[in-house]
UniProtKB/Swiss-Prot annotation:
Organism: Paracoccus denitrificans (strain Pd 1222)
NCBIfam families named in the record: serS
Keywords: Aminoacyl-tRNA synthetase, ATP-binding, Cytoplasm, Ligase, Nucleotide-binding, Protein biosynthesis
Function in brief: Catalyzes the attachment of serine to tRNA(Ser). Is also able to aminoacylate tRNA(Sec) with serine, to form the misacylated tRNA L-seryl-tRNA(Sec), which will be further converted into selenocysteinyl-tRNA(Sec).
Full protein name: Serine--tRNA ligase
Binding positions (L-serine): T231, S232, E233, E285, S385
Subunit description: Homodimer. The tRNA molecule binds across the dimer.
Cellular localisation: Cytoplasm
Amino acid sequence: MHDIRAIRENPAAFDAALALRNLPPVSPEILSLDADRRSRIAAAEAAQAEQNKASKEAGAAKGRGDEAEFQRLRALVTAKKDETARLQAEATALDAKLRELLLAVPNLPLDGVPPGKDEDDNVEIRRWGEPRAFDFAPREHFEIEGVRPGMDFETAAKLSGSRFVVLKGGVARVHRALAQFMLDLHTEEHGLAETWAPVLVLSEMMEGTGQLPKFGEDSYQTREGWWLIPTSEVTLTNTVNGDLVDHASLPRRMVAHSQCFRSEAGSAGRDTSGMLRQHQFEKVEMVSITDAESGVEEHARMTRCAEAVLERLGLPYRTIVLCGGDMGFGARITHDLEVWLPGQGKYREISSVSYCGDFQARRMNARYRPAGGGKPEFVHTLNGSGLAVGRTLIAVLENGQQADGSVKLPEVLHPYLGGRTRLGADGVLA
């Protein structure tokens, strides 16, 4: 959410930043509501003061036996009391309307975010690794002979419908190994604190990180009102919801491996084959809670943590910075990591690493005490995939596939597979 004071002070700059997202100006509507709300508050305070004055004068009139004046003042007290209540109710309604409007406005891009409308305008900033030269036509993951026995879409469709998968045997073991490897790397080498949290959360938590109220259709809600998390960003970031933390406790760097659930609204017809786009999937998510000065540096650090996973696995990738028109709702700047998928012959997103500034913190009312004292300030938040486990599995299978239908597995996974190094053409680890 945005700071209304900053919008009052420089509405032109606010609208100019939104223009980088290709959005029309909204400051006139915001400031009009704000002015109406403030005028009601001022009028309510004036009416309350008149009520207090009349009440005091009524007491004096009663004391000197002036019954007529007492009755007049008592009626005035009642009228001002009713007026105060009416104005306060109007101010409360306007405040709710203003908050609703502010909650629907996305975060402002950082200076330097490239302008653009969509993914075609994103800017590559680096790449790592050379795509492998195959001496045969590489297949997509679900076409590889050794993968087919362990990737069962037919049974999944019987159980749950489209965009689900049942993993079996060696493929399931590799999937599990990837998640364990990612957690070990992030906790033991990158210094992130492993966290396990619920996958069902309250609406306030989804609002805190920006999924609600605008993007409710993208997630699943239970009859009881809980939401299934679309990412552990929701739970990890909201661990400081409503808190006032000490500066010395920052940065807080967390990582979680969880199930994630997305309705994929608006994705009809996209990636319908294979397990690239699923309603239920696993992800290792990184979140940092930091102060106002460290956010940009922390963003670079988190990006490197995600890149390290791909490098250890030997997977070619490129890092891009998203243009204003392609950034997510809560981000000020986003780095996407795209891994090379030889079966598709192109790079596909496998991680998004975003710096959100104090945007989420204002929604959560999450603050910290500055080390030198002074007024509490809002924390700054960051989140990033480290990585999406299913998509990493796809990349490992496609990049490691062999002409005979087997898959050569990355060396860093061997200890997690009991020393096994390959997925055979029969789907058995060997």
